[in-house]
Amino acid sequence: VMELGRTLVKEKEHLKHNIRFICFGAEEIGLYGSRAYCEAHPDFMKKIRFMMNFDAAGRAGRQGFCLHGWPKLEPLFRDVIAEIGTDLPMWTQVGPYSDHWPFLLQGVATATMGDPDEAAKRGGRGFGHTKFDTVDKVDLRAMRECAGNAAVAAFKVLNMDDWSYQQRTQAEIG
């Protein structure tokens, strides 16, 4: 997240829209931070174009995009992947187990970065959420790739004049 911010601040004069970086801690115990944020900012929720979740940043594998049930975003992210110029996964999977969830429930388009193939190979959580989940397990290549790919996506989203991906209504979320 910090590397993405560092990258985008260098290009701030070329960004048409604002970006907000929010870090929530310990989502594993109940998404308290992200839920509280969404509840405390109902008017702001209506203005958000997109929420990118970095819960899986640092895991091995390619750093693609999981669109949480937003198939209309697929052409946009195909363009992002084409700009990046490498083979990246893009898939959709809706799950309530990370900080994107309260935003999704507010109708905001959300995505998480990662690699479904890596997750399948890992089989379970790996070291995650154990006493062995330490900084030496972080894949620095994956972190760099995640920051770079996220920067391309953010730059594209922040510079679109026409955002035709409207938020979902509560009936659509159902």
Model-predicted segments: where are they?
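Metal-dependent peptidase/peptidase-like ectodomains
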Residues: 25-125, 162
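His/Asp/Glu-rich mid-to-C-terminal helical/loop segments that flank catalytic regions of hydrolases
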Residues: 6, 10, 121-174
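Generic, well-ordered alpha-helical scaffold segments in large soluble proteins
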Residues: 4-11, 40, 80, 106, ...
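Alpha-helical metal-binding/catalytic segments enriched in His/Glu/Asp
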Residues: 1-31, 150
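Flexible, active-site-adjacent loop/turn segments at secondary-structure boundaries
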Residues: 13, 22, 35, 63, ...
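Solvent-exposed, flexible loop/coil residues
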Residues: 19, 41, 52, 71, ...
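Acidic/histidine-enriched alpha-helical segments
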Residues: 14-26, 51-54, 163-174
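Solvent-exposed, polar/charged alpha-helical surfaces in well-ordered, non-transmembrane soluble domains
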Residues: 2-6, 35, 75-79, 101, ...
